[in-house]
């Protein structure tokens, strides 16, 4: 059974630490620890995430997650920007214990630049502008420098010719944490191709980059060998690329259709779904991306991941979807799905609703929610009590030739910035229901 979960890694925020000094910043505070993991479709009795993995060191409520202490230290991450030295005369801070004490650890991997000579230390001290690298008696011949720990910077040092997706995601495999980065090749000089944003007219998500959060090891997997740009780079640098078939199945199960690419393709598809030249020329049958209310403000609907059974399929799969409206009209006319599982990875599938049927669009559903007396009264009551009501993303869930809409309602106290799920709104056609959970609202 497929389940979607959210993974939030715990990186070290060096800027917020107390008693900052060279020893503490460079030798002791070297890594983050573990991750909080929660399913996207359930909460606890207080409306907070129903954590599958929590605490430091990590503890799992599900045995199969197997988040271990040794495998989930985060030396390399999105927010980890400072260099550190490991295997020094100082033990590293690991995690807090009771009574103000701290657990300590030592780096066990043979990664980083070995500080085993005066000339190495002198060169690095000059490069880093840090004389302590040269003169500190806390560094020995086995000490190592971990440099370029930000995963964006680290990948760019290896493959500067790739453009990285701004939103890498963390996955857990056999107790360890890995970062998966979607990497792109692009040009604005591809013949007979329309431009996106006056900068790009050819874009491929040909490479998946995997970074081990503990060791910093990086693997680049070539997923689209038909991409002539990536293929050329792989011939120039044959040792840094691996084929997609070499990616372990445990990692490949987490590969997903990238949201940035899907967003760009969706925007182009608003016009280029039209195949009749005359209709295209006069601008008929063009579509638009609908709007929704999020945090009480109007915004364009963004693509979102769902686990669902696509029409015509027999099994659930992980997909990225986005609905479309006819231009200047509020109803939903079609939707696009980007597929992520198995042999269907990277495929797009478009669905168009029958023209004789009017399917309410997100804007219409938001209006129905606003007009419902019971919902409006409850939201006003919460607002008047000094709490902030947060209307979450409106999700359109296709079911056969119809759809249902789901919108979570969160409540956040002014003194405590911790949103709690308090209600779920479900809409089917013109029928609206708001209950404490999805199942009750649906039935």
Predicted regions and their residues:
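Soluble extracytoplasmic regions of secretory-pathway and membrane proteins
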Residues: 1-443
């Amino acid at each position: 059974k497929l389940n979607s979960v959210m993974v939030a890694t715990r990186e070290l925020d060096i800027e917020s630490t107390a008693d900052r000094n060279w020893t503490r910043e460079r030798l002791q505070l070297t890594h983050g620890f573990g991750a909080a993991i929660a399913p996207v479709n359930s909460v606890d009795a207080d409306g907070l995430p129903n954590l599958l993995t929590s605490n430091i060191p990590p503890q799992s409520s599900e045995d199969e997650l197997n988040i271990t202490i040794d495998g989930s230290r985060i030396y390399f991450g999105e927010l980890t920007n400072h260099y550190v030295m490991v295997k020094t005369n100082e033990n590293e801070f690991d995690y807090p214990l009771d009574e103000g004490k701290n657990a300590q650890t030592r780096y066990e991997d043979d990664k980083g630049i070995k500080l085993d000579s005066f000339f190495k230390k002198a060169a690095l001290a000059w490069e880093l502008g840090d004389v302590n690298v040269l003169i500190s008696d806390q560094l020995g011949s086995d000490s190592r420098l971990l440099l370029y720990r930000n995963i964006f910077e680290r990948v760019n040092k290896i493959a500067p010719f790739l453009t990285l997706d701004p939103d890498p995601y963390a996955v857990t495999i056999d107790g360890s944490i890995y970062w998966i980065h979607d990497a792109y090749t692009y040009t604005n000089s591809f013949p007979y191709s329309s431009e996106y944003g006056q900068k790009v007219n050819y874009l491929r998500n040909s490479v998946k980059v995997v970074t081990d959060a503990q060791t910093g090891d990086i693997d680049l997997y070539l997923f689209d060998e038909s991409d002539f740009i990536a293929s050329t780079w792989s011939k120039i640098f044959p040792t840094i690329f691996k084929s997609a078939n070499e990616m372990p199945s445990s990692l490949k199960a987490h590969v997903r259709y990238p949201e940035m690419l899907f967003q760009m393709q969706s925007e182009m598809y608003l016009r280029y779904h039209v195949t009749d030249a005359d209709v295209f020329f006069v601008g008929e049958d063009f579509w638009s991306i609908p709007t929704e209310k999020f945090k009480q403000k109007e915004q364009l609907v963004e693509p979102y991941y769902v686990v669902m059974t696509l029409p015509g399929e027999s099994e659930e799969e992980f997909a990225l979807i986005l609905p479309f409206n006819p231009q200047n009209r509020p109803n939903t006319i079609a939707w696009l799905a980007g597929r992520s599982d198995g042999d269907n990875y990277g495929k797009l599938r478009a669905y168009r609703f029958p023209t004789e049927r009017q399917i309410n669009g997100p804007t219409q559903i938001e209006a129905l929610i606003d007009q419902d007396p019971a919902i409006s009264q409850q939201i006003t009551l919460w607002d008047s009590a000094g709490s902030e009501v947060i209307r979450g993303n409106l999700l359109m869930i296709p079911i056969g030739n119809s759809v249902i809409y789901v919108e979570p309602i969160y409540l956040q106290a002014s003194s405590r910035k911790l949103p709690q799920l308090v209600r779920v709104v479900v809409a089917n056609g013109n029928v609206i229901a708001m209950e404490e959970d999805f199942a009750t609202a649906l039935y």
